[in-house]
């Protein structure tokens, strides 16, 4: 890996959960530069359309460039076709772009999630352009192994919005306790047919388990 891609990384734990009627995309907020905490307020959940979001893990510069590209591509898709882009189509556009650049890859792990006429869905997209439709939940980044332990244990089908938020926050908290590249609080986005909402910090605090 070149020095350029070693400079600033998001480190990261990201989580995507499908619930009854929508999707939760959640991340923590730490960005690292080697052993240095480079940022305590890194934004890792981005709006792609009013019904689709994307989380980023990996190189900050690579990820931010991809956010700009997919924003433009989704806007062009909707202008040309005169209809809203689906979650699957957005993931495919991103996947194709990454695959075309696989010999000079972007150092990223991405989640693309949202709602369309088929309902809620979340896709994971790797640096080579591999896109996978995740049925229930997914986690990426350096803290994902710890997050998966919580997700596997506590996920249940047809969760409510409240239950899904609580699970996402709990999974992130577990990762932050064990992964040095994850920390500094939470970003949580709720996506349904009615809203694309960034959950404020005071509301997120209400989902945190009591301190031991």
Swiss-Prot record:
Q: Where in the cell is it found?
A: Cytoplasm
Instruction: Give a yes or no for keyword Cytoplasm in this entry.
Output: yes
- Give the keywords, sorted: Autocatalytic cleavage, Cytoplasm, Hydrolase, Protease, Proteasome, Threonine protease, Zymogen
GO molecular function terms attached to this record: threonine-type endopeptidase activity
Q: Which GO terms describe its biological process?
A: proteasomal protein catabolic process
Q: Which sites are catalytic?
A: 12
EC top class named in words: hydrolase
**What EC number(s) does this enzyme carry?**
3.4.25.1
One cellular component term from this protein's GO annotations in UniProt: cytoplasm
> Quick check: keyword Protein biosynthesis in the entry?
no
Propeptide intervals in chain numbering: 1-11
Entry's transmembrane regions: none
One Pfam family for this entry, by name?
Answer: Proteasome
Annotated control of activity: The formation of the proteasomal ATPase PAN-20S proteasome complex, via the docking of the C-termini of PAN into the intersubunit pockets in the alpha-rings, triggers opening of the gate for substrate entry. Interconversion between the open-gate and close-gate conformations leads to a dynamic regulation of the 20S proteasome proteolysis activity.
**Highest taxon listed in the record's lineage:** Archaea
Catalytic function, reaction form: Cleavage of peptide bonds with very broad specificity
Subunit-level organization: The 20S proteasome core is composed of 14 alpha and 14 beta subunits that assemble into four stacked heptameric rings, resulting in a barrel-shaped structure. The two inner rings, each composed of seven catalytic beta subunits, are sandwiched by two outer rings, each composed of seven alpha subunits. The catalytic chamber with the active sites is on the inside of the barrel. Has a gated structure, the ends of the cylinder being occluded by the N-termini of the alpha-subunits. Is capped at one or both ends by the proteasome regulatory ATPase, PAN.
Family affiliation: Belongs to the peptidase T1B family.
What's its job?
Component of the proteasome core, a large protease complex with broad specificity involved in protein degradation.
Q: What is this protein called?
A: Proteasome subunit beta
Q: Which organism is it from?
A: Methanocorpusculum labreanum (strain ATCC 43576 / DSM 4855 / Z)
């Amino acid at each position: 890996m070149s020095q350029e891609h070693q400079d600033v990384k998001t480190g990261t734990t990201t989580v995507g959960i499908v619930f009854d009627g929508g999707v939760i995309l959640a991340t923590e907020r730490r960005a690292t530069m080697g052993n240095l905490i480079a940022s305590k307020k890194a934004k890792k959940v981005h709006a792609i359309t009013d019904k689709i979001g994307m989380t980023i893990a990996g190189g900050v510069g690579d990820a931010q460039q991809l956010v700009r590209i997919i924003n433009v591509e989704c806007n062009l898709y909707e202008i040309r076709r005169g209809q809203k882009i689906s979650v699957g189509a957005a993931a495919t556009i991103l996947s194709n772009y990454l695959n075309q650049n696989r010999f000079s890859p972007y150092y990223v792990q991405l989640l693309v999630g949202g709602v369309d006429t088929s309902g809620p869905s979340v896709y994971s997209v790797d640096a080579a352009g591999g896109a996978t439709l995740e049925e229930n939940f997914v986690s990426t980044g350096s803290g994902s192994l710890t997050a998966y332990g919580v997700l596997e244990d506590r996920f249940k089908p047809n969760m409510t919005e409240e239950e899904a938020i609580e699970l996402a926050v709990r999974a992130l908290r577990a990762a932050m306790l064990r992964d040095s590249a994850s920390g500094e609080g939470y970003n949580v986005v709720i996506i349904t047919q009615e809203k694309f909402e960034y959950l404020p910090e005071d509301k997120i605090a209400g989902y945190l388990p009591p301190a031991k």
